[in-house]
């Protein structure tokens, strides 16, 4: 199946490590900031300077009050301004002049201006880093997903995958762009604030710090609970998105069975489950915020009570009490920011684990370290003792002992009852799966020894249900060869019998086909797919019941285009219509995963057996 990440690098599951903070995902996330390292450093420096300036504000305000009321001398921080701007316009209380107050006010203005400048630098640079990291992570995740095997996408709902690309990575963005800088800036504010508080009054500082242990314990308890609930919420929201994706992509089936209410109820139930988790998360936050805030208020209340007693006793100037109060609020804010960061980290932990789980997923189709080069491909495809089963669908063999050779340029038709293994057999040709036993070769080389991209460059597939992308007709044809010229696109459409109907549209080849080609008919979509395959010009062609869902008129046009497409190419046709079977070089009859008959149409009819039974059931009316 899929190789899981190693124990050392794998992120924890939803319950694993739920009682502790796992920093491994965040160390890994920091690796994505390397291309923006100088911007991150600049943001860190600006944030540190801003934090120091914010610490200067209470000190300057305290000096302003002490000087205004003659309660103390000017501190070194504002002394240079008093010396520079101070005058003798008249003596005030305690020898302080109005010019001294003016100088201190100028310091305040300078602090505010510098703080505004550092805030601008920090916010802009962090925004650049955060958006850049998220864009890089989304690109890497999407590119990685495209390289995984078909089996991966069969076991993962599309909505779940898109949820990882959108909501989970958005949750990570705040952690990447904010946590590190906030950690540094709040550390500067906390440590610097506590140091200044000790300088002002050590006893009062100890009283204030007595409240901290209770606040930290509360943050840890609530943070652990919040992490569990947030992980569950993200999982439930992804499940809801998966259901919505299914219903929207199959809207015609939903409406044809009048199942709108059923799908709405299914999605509504999934949303109600996610909503219940969201409410649990809201309740935890609602308890967490006031609990921590109450602890802060208790600390501030203690400072006011004890500091007021010191001021009344003359042991603490009133300006210093104001400075102490402002710094206490700053320290409390820093502690609150740390608890908020802890919650943010806890919420992002679940999202980052899920994203990295996808990034760590490995395809069950390993690429060779030194792939064999494909030069001139002749197109001989050989199945040697091939046995295959899906594993997750039971232990029965879907293909059992297949030995088959398709010579270069030969058309091989595959027929048999439903579930015989026809579609599974052709999926082995472009190596969407590997056989469990035996091997498949191209020109004598095991497909597992080839680069999958190189192999698939030489294989073209036209399925029964054609998927077009929501662009123009020209873009969909050019999908077979992106660098093709407009003339080559038109030539491929002409060969596919598509040019005539394309030119009937007002916008011609610029006509938008809609999501999955919904604006075109089935026959038109099929001819666009054939033009796409013609432009790719593969050596090997796989036609998976390419005309079975078309009406007679569309089938005739598509059949002519297919005959042009098959010229000179090794072709596997899962046959459903008589015309394709009659013209095949060989017809291979499958039943229960085994080859039971091989031959041309007339030979198999004369031989009898399963093929003639299928012919009599399916083809007699057409032949008549």
Task: Label each residue range with its predicted role.
Residues 30, 34, 150-151, 167-176, ...:
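An intracellular "coupling" helix at the cytosolic face of ABC transporter transmembrane type-1 domains
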Residues 8-19, 69-73, 131, 139-163, ...:
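Short intracellular "coupling" helices and adjacent cytoplasmic loop segments at the cytosolic face
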Residues 374-624:
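ABC-type nucleotide-binding domain
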Residues 39-52, 181-232, 303-316, 333:
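Transmembrane helices of ABC transporter permease
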Residues 196-210, 280, 284-353, 358-359:
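Helix-loop-helix
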Residues 40-117, 198-203, 301, 305, ...:
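Transmembrane helix-loop-helix hairpins at lipid-water interfaces of multipass membrane proteins
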Residues 14-22, 45-46, 53-69, 107-158, ...:
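Juxtamembrane helix-loop junctions of ABC transporter transmembrane domains
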Residues 22-37, 161:
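A short amphipathic helical element positioned immediately N-terminal to and/or at the very start
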């Amino acid at each position: 199946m899929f190789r899981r990440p190693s124990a050392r690098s794998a992120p924890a599951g939803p319950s694993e490590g739920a009682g502790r903070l796992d920093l491994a995902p965040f160390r890994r996330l920091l690796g994505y900031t390397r291309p923006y390292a100088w911007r991150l450093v600049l943001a860190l420096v600006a944030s540190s300077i801003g934090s120091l300036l914010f610490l200067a504000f209470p000190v300057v305000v305290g000096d302003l009050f002490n000087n205004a009321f003659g309660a103390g001398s000017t501190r070194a921080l504002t002394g240079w301004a008093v010396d520079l701007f101070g005058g003798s316009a008249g003596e005030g209380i305690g020898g302080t002049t109005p010019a001294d107050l003016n100088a201190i006010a100028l310091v305040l203005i300078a602090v505010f201006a510098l703080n505004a400048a550092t805030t601008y630098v920090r916010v802009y640079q962090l925004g650049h880093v955060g958006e850049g990291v998220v864009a890089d992570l989304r690109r890497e995740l999407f590119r990685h997903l495209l390289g995984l095997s078909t089996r991966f996408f069969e076991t993962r709902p599309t909505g779940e995958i898109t949820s990882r690309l959108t909501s989970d990575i958005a949750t990570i963005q705040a952690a990447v762009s904010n946590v590190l800088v906030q950690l540094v800036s709040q550390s500067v504010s906390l440590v610097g604030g506590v140091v200044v508080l000790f300088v002002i009054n050590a006893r009062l500082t100890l009283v204030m710090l007595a409240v901290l242990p209770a606040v930290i314990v509360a943050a840890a308890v609530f943070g652990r609970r919040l992490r569990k609930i947030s992980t569950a919420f993200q999982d439930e929201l992804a499940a809801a998105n998966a259901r919505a994706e299914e219903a929207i992509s199959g809207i015609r089936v939903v409406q044809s069975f009048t199942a709108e209410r059923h799908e709405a109820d299914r999605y509504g139930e999934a949303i109600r489950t996610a909503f219940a988790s969201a409410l649990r998360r809201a309740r935890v936050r609602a308890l967490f915020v006031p609990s921590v805030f109450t602890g802060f208020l208790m600390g501030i209340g203690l400072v006011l009570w004890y500091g007021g007693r010191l001021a009344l006793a003359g042991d603490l100037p009133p300006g210093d009490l104001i400075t102490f109060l402002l710094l206490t609020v700053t320290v409390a804010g820093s502690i609150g920011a740390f608890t908020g960061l802890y919650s943010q980290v806890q919420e992002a932990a679940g999202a980052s684990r899920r994203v990295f789980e996808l990034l760590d997923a490995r395809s069950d189709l390993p690429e060779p370290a030194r792939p064999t080069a494909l030069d001139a491909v002749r197109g001989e495809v050989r199945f040697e003792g091939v046995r295959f089963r899906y594993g997750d669908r039971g232990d029965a063999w879907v293909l059992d002992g297949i030995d088959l050779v398709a010579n270069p340029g030969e058309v091989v038709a595959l027929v048999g009852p439903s579930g015989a293994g026809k579609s599974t057999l052709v999926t082995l040709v472009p190596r969407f799966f590997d056989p469990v036993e035996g091997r498949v070769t191209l020109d004598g080389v095991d497909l597992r020894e080839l680069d999958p991209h190189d192999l698939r460059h030489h294989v073209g597939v036209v399925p029964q249900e054609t998927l077009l992308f929501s662009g123009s007709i020209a873009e969909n044809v050019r999908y077979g060869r992106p660098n093709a010229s407009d003339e080559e696109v038109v030539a491929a459409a002409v060969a596919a019998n598509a040019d005539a109907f394309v030119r009937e549209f007002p916008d011609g080849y610029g006509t938008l086909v809609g999501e999955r080609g919904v604006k075109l008919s089935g026959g038109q979509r099929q001819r666009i797919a054939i033009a796409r395959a013609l432009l790719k010009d593969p050596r090997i062609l796989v036609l998976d019941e390419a005309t079975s869902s078309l009406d007679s008129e569309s089938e005739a046009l598509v059949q002519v285009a297919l005959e042009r497409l098959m010229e000179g190419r090794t072709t596997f046709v899962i046959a459903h219509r008589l015309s394709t079977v009659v013209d095949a070089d060989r017809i291979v009859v499958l039943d229960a995963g085994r080859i039971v008959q091989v031959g041309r149409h007339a030979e198999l009819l004369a031989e009898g057996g399963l093929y003639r039974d299928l012919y009599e059931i399916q083809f007699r009316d057409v032949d008549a």
